[in-house]
């Protein structure tokens, strides 16, 4: 009897591994990083993918509150996969009711999906609409977080207390928790969620696109447009100019360590810009500090290729796919220890390029190293270029298919 039962379970698992899964991905809005992944998922033989958007911000021009400017990405966001825009009854702002898409319920019920991948945060009403509809329809429900600690962006202690109490309950709502990094995996595990309920689905970008675009870029032309010669060092900051990204730390470290021939480039917009401009003027380095404003996706590969090093000194950074992007373009990366990508992408190949967040002197020392040993800097870029393939779309999709399989198996055993 035991042998027969084991054989039955083995056969069921083999059938599950070969099964074609009908999947709905629920996303808050089109994102330039996810669109190519959705296209790849749509081409995956084991998946029948449909995407439901709660908003079309990003594909349509709209104010991005963090960039503090209107953003419309200049790469295809809605091509190559099946999608639906669900009417939003909410205001569209960042509040709980900002995304309120009751139409998700009918779509999920009528679609008879095997699984839902939810990319809407639990602080939005639409997350709970999707969760309720998945449960009612019998679909597996998968979601996660990119956070690698309980620390909130604004540092408020009550939020840590809340997360400690609520997050164990929250993540038990998932039939499988999907996480983008080792740090996130360990954080979810610390909440009491078992290993078997967590799948690492590594954050990635469209590596092939970034590498191809970088190969076509004219490095010297881009550098000349930035006012740099072939001998000058370009330090790049590519992110929103927000306090938690700590662009001021980089500016101050650059002012202390940067020789006359070096250039600091800020690619991004945000509320910190006036303070940065004032600080550069105060320190007398305004001619060596460039503010490019918001840079759209199609222009970024050339910028990474022109830079000698990317620096991200954030004190709060769940992951940072700019690290993936830069590595795909052969640009070495210096990051703080609070950047989620540090552990999986930077530490394995260039651990000396990680510094304690908020330590301006440590960052200045790393910049001095960059200025004085250009060949080691280039070698760091080559190592990063090779290592970023561990975070490829193929690996992400294979892991996602496995997570879906495990989630459906959990539901099957619960019935």
Residue ranges and their predicted role:
Residues 125, 140-142, 149-173:
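Nucleotide-sugar donor phosphate/pyrophosphate-binding loop at the beta->alpha transition
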Residues 160, 164-219:
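Donor nucleotide-sugar binding/catalytic pocket of nucleotide-sugar-dependent glycosyltransferases
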Residues 229-254:
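Conserved donor-binding/catalytic core segment of Leloir-type glycosyltransferases
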Residues 294-295, 302-307, 400:
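Short alpha-helical donor nucleotide-sugar binding micro-motif in glycosyltransferases
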Residues 315:
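Aromatic "clamp/platform" in nucleotide-sugar-dependent glycosyltransferases that forms part
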Residues 332-336:
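Short hydrophobic beta-strand element within catalytic cores of glycosyltransferases
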Residues 347-360, 369-374:
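Conserved acidic donor-binding segment of nucleotide-sugar-dependent glycosyltransferases
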Residues 362, 369, 376-390:
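A short, well-ordered alpha-helix in the C-terminal region of glycosyltransferases
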């Amino acid at each position: 009897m035991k042998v027969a039962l084991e054989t039955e379970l083995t056969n069921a698992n083999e059938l599950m591994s070969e099964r074609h899964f009908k999947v709905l991905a629920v996303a808050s809005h089109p994102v330039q990083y996810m669109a190519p992944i959705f296209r790849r998922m749509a081409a995956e033989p084991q998946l029948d993918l449909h995407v439901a958007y709660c908003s079309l911000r990003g594909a349509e021009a709209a104010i991005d509150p963090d960039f503090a400017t209107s953003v419309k990405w200049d790469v295809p966001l809605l091509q190559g996969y099946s999608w639906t825009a669900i009417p939003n009854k909410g205001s569209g702002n960042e509040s709980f009711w900002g995304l309120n898409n009751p139409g998700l319920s009918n779509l999920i019920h009528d679609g008879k999906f095997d699984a839902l991948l939810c990319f809407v945060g639990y602080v939005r009403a639409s997350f709970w609409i999707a969760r309720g509809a998945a449960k009612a329809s019998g679909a597996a429900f998968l979601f996660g977080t990119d956070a690698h600690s309980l620390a909130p962006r604004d540092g408020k202690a009550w939020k840590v207390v809340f997360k400690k109490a609520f997050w164990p309950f929250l993540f038990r709502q998932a039939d499988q928790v999907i996480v983008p990094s080792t740090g996130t995996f360990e954080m979810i595990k610390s909440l009491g969620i078992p290993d078997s309920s967590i799948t690492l689905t590594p954050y990635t970008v469209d590596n092939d696109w970034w590498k191809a675009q970088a190969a076509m870029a004219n490095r010297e032309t881009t550098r000349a447009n930035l006012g740099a010669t072939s001998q000058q060092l370009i330090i790049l900051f590519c992110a929103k100019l927000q306090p938690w990204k700590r662009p001021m730390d980089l500016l101050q470290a650059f002012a202390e360590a940067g020789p006359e021939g070096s250039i600091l480039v800020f690619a991004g917009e945000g509320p910190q810009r006036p303070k940065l401009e004032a600080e550069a003027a105060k320190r007398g380095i305004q001619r060596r500090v460039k503010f490019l404003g918001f840079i759209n996706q199609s222009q970024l590969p050339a910028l990474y290729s022109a830079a000698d090093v990317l620096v991200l000194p954030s004190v709060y950074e769940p992951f940072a796919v700019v690290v993936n992007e830069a590595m795909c373009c052969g640009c070495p990366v210096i990051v703080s220890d609070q950047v989620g990508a540090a552990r999986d992408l930077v530490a394995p190949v260039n651990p000396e390029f990680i510094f304690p967040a908020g330590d301006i002197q440590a960052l200045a020392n790393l910049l001095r190293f960059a200025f004085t040993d250009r060949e080691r800097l280039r070698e760091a870029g080559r190592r990063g270029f090779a290592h970023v393939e561990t975070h490829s779309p193929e690996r992400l999709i294979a892991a996602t298919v496995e997570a879906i399989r495990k989630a459906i198996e959990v539901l099957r055993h619960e019935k």
